Amino acid sequence: FNWITDLYVKHFTKVPLVINYHRWMGAGKDWAGEENFDPDSKRLLDSACEKGFSLRHDAFGMREYYGQRERNYVKPWIMKRPVLLEGGWIVSKHPYHNDPSGYKTAKDVRIGEFEDGQEAHVNMMDFRVGDETMSWFRDAYPLVERFISEGGYRLYPDSIVVPKEMKSGSRIKIVHRWNNLGWGYCPTNIPQWNQKYKVAFALLNQDNQVVYSYLDNNTDLSVWIKGYPTSYEFTPKLHGVKKGTYT
């Protein structure tokens, strides 16, 4: 396990890596009853996450295969590593009526998957392909719309204070505050991204072209969590700015 995860980390330095948080990790089993699991799975999965792996599961909505053990495992990693959702039931083929949740329709299955994803604060929803994708749009389109507006990360500045007039060569103060309307987070903290995304400000000329730009290196998008606005004071120096009107 360490050999293969180390190999991926070594060679995929710019691409996010993802691992399934399965209860039988490396144990040669797929399932042995809801109450059973390999106690070593948590240690192995934690080691992968600490190396920079993100998390996914392919049984969301299945009350047996995505049970309390899976829910408990992912909790400490929420907002530390992004979580990806894939539903377990293929509604056109699987006997989803047997699920302990008592699903009666395909819409019920989609609701169960969505609610499990909301609980895990997932960043992405995998609609699969073919009939499964069609089911999401046919049977549960309002949930698709909800994920677009609520899921993952939805970042916006609700306050930006800048001076109206500035003097070239002077240092100005910009106060900006950011909110996340999504239940997920922007995973700039994963090693493959390594904080590569930051907030920047620019002066635009009358043709709406960027002529000067300033990067606020103190911003960390991964800590912007829903319900907790984050504020910054940025004091760039306007070196070499020509006299004029900018936006």
Locate each region found by the language model.
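Catalytic-core regions of glycoside hydrolase
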Residues: 2-131
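Internal, hydrophobic beta-strand segments that form the core of beta-sheet-rich folds
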Residues: 197-203, 244-247
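Short, acidic/polar linear motifs in exposed loop/turn regions
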Residues: 180-184, 207, 238-242
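Structural beta-strand segments of beta-rich domains
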Residues: 170-174
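Catalytic cores of secreted or luminal carbohydrate-active enzymes
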Residues: 110-163
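Short coil-to-beta strand junction motifs in C2/discoidin
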Residues: 187-200
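A beta-strand/beta-hairpin structural motif
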Residues: 211-242, 247
